[in-house]
Amino acid sequence: YPMDDPDLLTGRRLETEALRRALAAPGRPGAACWASRAMEQRRARFARMPAGSVGYERWNELNEGLASYLEDLAQERHAPDLPADGYGPDTVRTAVYGVGPALADLLDRFDSAWKTKIDSGTAAGLDQLLTVDLPLAESAGCSFTAEEKERARAQAGEDTAKLVTGRKADRAAFFARPGVRLVIEAGSHPLGLQGFDPLNMEALGGSEVLHKRLLQLSNDRGTLEVFNREALTEGADAGDHHPLFAGVRTLTLSGLAAEPKVTREGETVKIETEGFTATLKGALVETTGNGVRIIRITWPPDPPPPAGATPPTAPGPHSSTD
């Protein structure tokens, strides 16, 4: 997800503010007008984003966001309290718990049948339904001032710059920890994401992600779990896609107090250390030490595949909230 783009963050901040004003509007015309401004900001933002990132945002609003909306209804809470200064560049996941219910509340105002449309699968996202339902005659007459736009732009520039600086510092601190380092290189058999905590992870840019609580991976060669310690993953896909969903090519743990316990039984290798376990088939274990002692886990190269064979793919992802 492109978190470090100041223009995208500017659009997201203006969209959130427009939603705040729509929810606060006492009458239908004001709500329709500011909801329209929010959807305009969203369309412009989504047009500049990778399709996978757009789908990620819509999917989470439709699932996590609607779950929050239903919880608000059950507890008789009023409209969601969206932050006046918007959401930060690295709080995309957090934002869906406010923006999703906000879109649902506005749909309640403009389309009494929207829940039926969602249940029937005729809408891909809450924002798409709202865009269709807004009355054109009531959607004009409000806009952000030039000063408001410039203020949002300046703040987004500062926030994304801080994000990039913080990422570099966190990555450097991870690799600077004294102690043993464990590196697992999956090679041509990427490790599939089976469990993770989306609220306790940090995208470092490119295909690197720093996991701060939970990570579960597996492939046709075994399984591994990291719990209550940090681990850094490098995704198998270095393009514009999600850095985890194509699988993990390399996993690194740093700052281990001692070498992991490694036991073998036939072709199976079991690796254990504080906060980490792995059971792997056919793995090779190599220890090197040039300043930092590194335990490297690899596999022998695959034999040449037969003609027409399909390369291995990583299993599908699951989060700890599934």
Q: Predicted regions span which residues?
A:
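Non-membrane alpha-helical secondary structure
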Residues: L8-E15, G30-A31, A95, V99, ...
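Active-site-proximal alpha-helical
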Residues: A51-K149
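Post-HExxH zinc-binding segment in Zn-dependent metallohydrolases
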Residues: Y1-P80
